[in-house]
Swiss-Prot record:
Pfam families: Abhydrolase_1. Catalyzes an unusual C-C bond hydrolysis of 2-hydroxy-6-oxo-6-phenylhexa-2,4-dienoic acid (HOPDA) to produce benzoic acid and 2-hydroxy-2,4-pentadienoic acid (HPD). This is 2-hydroxy-6-oxo-6-phenylhexa-2,4-dienoate hydrolase. It catalyses: 2,6-dioxo-6-phenylhexa-3-enoate + H2O = 2-oxopent-4-enoate + benzoate + H(+). Gene3D superfamilies: alpha/beta hydrolase. GO terms for cellular component: membrane. Belongs to the AB hydrolase superfamily. BphD family.
Length: 286
């Protein structure tokens, strides 16, 4: 297979959905087959490609059409200020993307904020989702064991409010378990993405004031989710507590949980090969 690159897979589409009128969404796309839409997290400078470039090739080789979507306000998608909880608004944008691309049904893979988006999508549009894959998703309220917000979330908001290279480095040191993975290339790429889009930083903070994290909690509705669900968590996640994985397994009727040892908040990146094998097997056989 020809090597996939960000530029060779980059596309744009206009969506029209509640809250979005001719709103431009950027995404990366490759492959043919059942559609898998991958949804990134909410850190400064995040985007679909940077979140999932270690995964897209394996899923394409396995026979899937893969879409890495930039959420509204992130990376190359249009700017936005949200006055409702972000997971719900992002879910509407996923539906808008699917409508624009004539995708009737898709499997969703969501990390952190992207996991909150996927949960909301499964609740709001149950007929449009195939299988649901979650990695340390937000949107599950308080923890039984960890003070909230956790250390990583505090650093995330500090980086939004006072962006600096040093704060970015501190956040990534909490983000990943294996510190050797924090290379200058990783830091520089993320820092350039942050600097490229300063409006994104301001809009995220304004949106967080209008709809704070406390409004994201969908725990009481987990029993409504009918999609077969695969949940992964890093044992050493310092952004979203591990006991939220148990909350999902208790709440969703058809769910299973895999915990990665020596893993932080970015399981699909830090343990990419194992993650790819597990999720592809789940998509094929569950």
């Amino acid at each position: 297979m020809t090597a996939l690159t960000e530029s060779s897979t980059s596309k744009f589409v206009k969506i029209n959905e509640k809250g979005f009128s001719d709103f431009q969404i950027h995404y990366n796309e490759a492959g043919n087959g059942e559609t898998v839409i991958m949804l990134h997290g909410g850190g400064p400078g995040a985007g679909g490609w940077s979140n999932y470039y270690r995964n897209i090739g394996a899923f394409v080789e396995a026979g899937y059409r893969v879409i890495l979507k930039d959420s509204p306000g992130f990376n190359k998608s249009d700017a936005v200020v949200m006055d409702e909880q972000r997971g719900l608004v992002n879910a509407r944008a996923v539906k808008g993307l699917m409508d624009a691309l004539d995708i009737d049904r898709a499997h969703l893979v969501g990390n952190s904020m992207g996991g909150a988006t996927a949960l909301n999508f499964a609740l709001e549009y149950p007929d449009r989702i195939g299988k649901l894959i979650l990695m340390g998703p937000g949107g599950l309220g308080p923890s039984m064991f960890a003070p909230m917000p956790m250390e990583g979330i505090k650093l995330l908001f500090k980086l939004y409010a006072e962006p600096s290279y040093e704060t970015l480095k501190q956040m990534l040191q909490v983000f990943l378990y294996d510190q050797s993975l924090i290379t200058e290339e990783l830091l520089q790429g993320r820092w350039e993405a942050i600097q490229r889009n300063p409006e994104h930083l301001k809009n995220f903070l304004v949106s967080a004031q209008k709809a704070p994290l406390s409004t994201w909690d969908v725990s009481a509705r987990l029993g409504e989710i009918k999609a077969k669900t695969f949940i992964t968590w890093g044992r050493d996640d310092r952004f979203v507590p591990l006991d939220h994985g148990l909350k999902l397994v208790w709440g969703i009727n058809d769910a299973r949980l895999h915990v990665f040892s020596k893993c932080g908040h970015w399981a699909q990146w830090e343990h990419a090969d194992e993650f790819n094998r597990l999720v592809i097997d789940f998509l094929r056989h569950a």
